[in-house]
């Protein structure tokens, strides 16, 4: 009788444990499927990830340093909701030390360690320039920028008459043209030296967006048009009138303008030391690199004499974009986020 009672107890406990296991399995399997309904649409410095059906994934990107206590509270709120986090280098040298002397230092005062807030990181750096805190983190890293995910279709571009040789964007910082945040990241000091070469030696016509209150070489008088800040659509229209894009920037993580120019089939002339976007500059195909006002000369010669041989748009269509880079990103997320709410995602994109 005692043995029978003991068997009943054992069977009862076993059934109870099995029920708990089954309940937990069902919970974890179904939790991810319905999670997309709960994912908030976030704002800077956070960004959303979306699947190919434009449904938000349950991974929130941290794209820049926090600016205020409210950002800290939002991080805690999203974390408590069960959302996962991934870092992305979309802002200056983030998550490394930000060199721009005009940058907000709230994150340093609060001693934020963003590499400990996330499970993986999408970065933009050359291998030798990866910040030490990213190297030391041991987390999975992927070379991927937001601009790599730009949607570009196979539709040929309609022919457009080129009115200018180049375009360069450096927005105003203040009314006196004193050094500021914009002039630092757009490398205005180097740009002025290069503009003198471009105008005096090559007689190139160009558009300079943003520096309406700044003086630079008179060699460009009459051949370089200076405009104030342009709304996005107007800027795109002006850019399409130019043959190539000039980018002397260094402290720039993911210049969307580089990808936009490439997709307009414009070669790009880019500072070799730029933080991000360098991986889309392929010599003789999408553009050329330079570092100063001296070594820009042979690169200008190359672009201006071989302009029609560059095929930047075709290269981007074959190597980047939502369906190619987006698939790489989706595979990276599936590999490193086991609780991803869409385990069948084909490609992922980021809010830009």
Feature locations, PLM:
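Catalytic core of nucleotide-activated saccharide and alditol-phosphate transferases
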Residues: 63-180
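Conserved catalytic-core segment of nucleotide-activated headgroup transferases in glycan assembly
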Residues: 149-222
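Short alpha-helical segment that forms part of, or immediately flanks, the ligand-binding pocket
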Residues: 236, 255-263, 278-279
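A short alpha->beta transition loop at the rim of the catalytic pocket in nucleotide-sugar-dependent
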Residues: 243, 265-266
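Aromatic "clamp/platform" in nucleotide-sugar-dependent glycosyltransferases that forms part
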Residues: 250
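Short hydrophobic beta-strand element within catalytic cores of glycosyltransferases
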Residues: 267-271
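Short acidic/histidine- and often glycine-rich active-site loop of Leloir-type glycosyltransferases
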Residues: 272-284, 288-289
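A charged, aromatic-enriched C-terminal amphipathic alpha-helix characteristic of glycosyltransferases
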Residues: 291, 304-352
């Amino acid at each position: 009788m005692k043995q029978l009672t003991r068997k009943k107890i054992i069977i009862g406990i076993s059934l109870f444990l099995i029920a708990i296991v089954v309940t937990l399995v069902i919970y974890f399997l179904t939790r991810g499927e319905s999670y997309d309904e709960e994912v908030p649409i976030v704002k800077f410095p956070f960004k959303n990830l979306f699947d190919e059906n434009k449904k938000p994934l349950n991974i929130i990107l941290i794209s820049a340093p926090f600016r205020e206590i409210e950002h800290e509270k939002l991080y805690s709120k999203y974390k408590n909701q069960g959302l996962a986090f991934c870092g992305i280098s979309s802002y200056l040298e983030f998550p490394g030390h930000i060199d721009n002397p005009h940058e907000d230092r709230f994150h340093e005062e609060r001693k934020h360690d963003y590499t400990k807030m996330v499970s993986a990181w999408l970065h933009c750096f050359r291998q030798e320039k990866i910040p030490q805190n990213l190297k030391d983190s041991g987390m999975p890293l992927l070379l991927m920028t937001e601009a790599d995910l730009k949607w570009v279709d196979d539709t040929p571009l309609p022919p457009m008459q080129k009115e200018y040789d180049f375009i360069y964007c450096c927005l105003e910082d203040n009314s006196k043209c004193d050094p500021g945040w914009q002039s630092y990241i757009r490398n205005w000091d180097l740009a002025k030296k290069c503009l003198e070469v471009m105008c005096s030696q090559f007689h190139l016509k160009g558009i300079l967006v943003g520096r309406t209150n700044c003086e630079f070489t008179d060699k460009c008088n009459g051949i370089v048009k200076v405009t104030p800040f342009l709304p996005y659509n107007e800027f795109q229209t002006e850019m399409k009138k130019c043959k190539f894009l000039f980018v002397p920037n260094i402290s720039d993580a993911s210049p969307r303008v580089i990808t936009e120019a490439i997709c307009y089939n414009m070669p790009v002339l880019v500072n070799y030391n730029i933080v991000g976007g360098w991986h889309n500059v392929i010599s003789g195909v999408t553009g050329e690199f330079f570092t100063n006002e001296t070594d820009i000369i042979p690169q200008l010669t190359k672009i201006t004499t071989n302009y029609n041989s560059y095929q930047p748009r075709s290269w981007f269509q074959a190597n980047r974009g939502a369906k190619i880079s987006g698939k790489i990103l989706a595979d990276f997320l599936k590999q490193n986020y086991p609780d991803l709410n869409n385990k069948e995602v084909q490609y992922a994109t980021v809010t830009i």
